[in-house]
Each structure stands twice: as C-alpha cells, then as structure tokens.
Amino acid sequence: MLPSLQSLTKKVLAGQCLPTDQYYLLKCYDLWWYDSPITFDHNLGLIKSAGIKDGLDLNTALVKAVRENNYNLIKLFTEWGADINYGLVSVNTEHTRDLCRELGAKETLNEEEILRIFIDLKFYKTSSNIILCHEVFSNNPLLQKVNNLKMRIEIFWELRELIKKTDLLNNEFSLNTLLLKYWYAIAVRYNLKEAIQYFYQKYTHLNTWRLTCALCFNNVFDLHEAYEKDKIYMDLEEMMRVACIKDHNLSTIYYCYVLGANINQAMLASIQYYNIENMFFCMDLGADVFEENMPVGEGYELIRNILSLKIYSPSTAPLPKNTDPEIIDHVLKNYKSKNMMTFLSYDLR
C-alpha cells in the first residue's frame, strides 16, 4: 500500500518529541495508544508507547493492533509499511477481517507463511514482544495448519540444553503447553523482568520451570528473585545438576555452592555433560574427585587427560560466600579459572 501524504506526516510527527501541551495534535492524528503518545524510532523501526516501552517492530505492532481491533492503528501501521498479512494471525472478529481484506490481506495463510510469521514475531526478545507472542499463539487455530514437527523443532532448538538433559520438555506435551513453557523460558533466559512477572503471576504451576530455566541459562538475578523472594524451592543437589547442564554457568553454580550444594557432585555432573569450564571452576572451589571421575570421562580424551594430572588445587583467592546476585555477577564476570590456567600452561610432552 502506498502511504498517503497524511500518513507520512503522521510518521514524521511520531518521530519527534513534542511537549505535553501539544499532545492534542497527536490525539487528533490517532498517534495515541495506551493513553499516551505513539512514538516511532526511525533508526530501529520500532513503535513505542506507555504500554509497550520496549517497542515493537511495525509488523508486530500491527499484530497487536489487529488483536485489539484498533482500526485506526491497523490502517496507520499498514500505510507505514507493515505487512497486513501478519494481522491474520491475531484477527478475532469478522469486521476486522474485512478491514484486513480491504487493506490487501489474503483470504488465508498457508503453512509456510504461518511458520515464517511465527519465527519473525519471536525474533525480538523484549517483555512486550514475548507477552504478545504468548497471547497471540496460545490456542491459535492457525497453528493446526503447521506441521507439528516443524513447530516443535523451532521451540526445541532454543531450549536444546534443557531438552537433552531434563525431562521437563518432551514430545508428549501438547503444542500449547510447549509454547507456554517456551515463552516463559525465553523470558527467563533474557532476564525480561516484566514478562517473567507476567508468567509468574498467571502460571504458578510452572514455578519449578522458572527456577530450572534460571539455573540452566545462568540467570543468577532471577534465580535469587525466585529462590529468596518468591520462595520457589527444589532439591539443592538437583538445582546444582541443572546449573551444570550448560557450560560457562559459573554464576548459578556458585549460587548453589554457597547454598550448600556438594561441589564434588557438581564436578561429576559437569564431566557427564562434557562442560570443561564448569569442571575447572568446581576444582577452583575445592572439588577433588579426580580418580573417581575417570570412568565418567571415558570416550572423551581431553577430560581424561585433564583428570590424570596431579597438578590441581583449590583457588587461594576464595570468592565471597554471598548469594547477592550483584556481587556474584561482578566477581565472576571476567573470572579466569586458576586450575584451567595451570592445565593450559602444563607441558604435556
């Protein structure tokens, strides 16, 4: 659709920062959403308003406007360049569907188009976007057109560490349940605080899932929030095992260690998952089960070589025993393992 002169004027106006005494102009031009001005970031191509502080790209903003049956914004965003076909994933009334048709939308979307829109919409990892994706795709009949395996592959790829090493996600779950867990996991992985609180308040039966995601994705901030403030608990050794699933998870491993988890068990789990940095970090914290873990490293020559050497000792510069996530993040941000350095400088000849 070619933009009219009026829509171009609105786009320019939305890119400016007007004083409050000129807000009436924005209301007159329908540049008003969630009782506040609509702004358009021309560099990032993002629509922002009070209810969507993180911003939404044009196509996603259109999806939201269609879901809300906001006819003025549907027309505006389409004139600004949004693909009206994206609106078909969230249309919920015949009147809005008719408007989409008038603006050039297809009668229906095929499997490839639905999957592409799903992938595009989930690209931006912001609270506003993830919550919207959950609302749009939850129990969405359009997803019945998409091959179930293709949808599950899209979900499983970003959560592959959890898929491989826990039984908390599997093919027995309905697609709707998998999507809910997926959106929640993405919120935790990227520490999207508003989205985390949205899911936490609405889906209390997934509290353990939240804690698991925080441990696996090394989000020590939400781990602390969930454990200390929201009182979400798991077996401590299981918490440590989940923290060891993914390599470089120093912050969540250390958090569990301070709580009292067994560091030798953490070393064992790290070796089982072939996570070398985690393994060296456990050595720094005092893990010393080298001979006991040799059979576990069977078939992985590098780990067997590391464990066979008698050159390791706990770090002489102990870390502060504190569960404050700010302190943990600060101390471990640029952490270099003493025992890893010892191994790398050792002459293996």
From Swiss-Prot:
Some GO term, biological process aspect, for this entry: which one? Answer: taxis
One Pfam annotation reads ASFV_360
The ANK repeat units are at: 57-89
On whether DNA-binding is a keyword of this UniProt record, the answer is no
Swiss-Prot/TrEMBL keywords: ANK repeat
Phosphoprotein among keywords: no
As for family, the record states: Belongs to the asfivirus MGF 360 family.
The record's function comment reads: Plays a role in virus cell tropism, and may be required for efficient virus replication in macrophages.
Q: What is this protein called?
A: Protein MGF 360-12L
Organism ancestry: Viruses, Varidnaviria, Bamfordvirae, Nucleocytoviricota, Pokkesviricetes
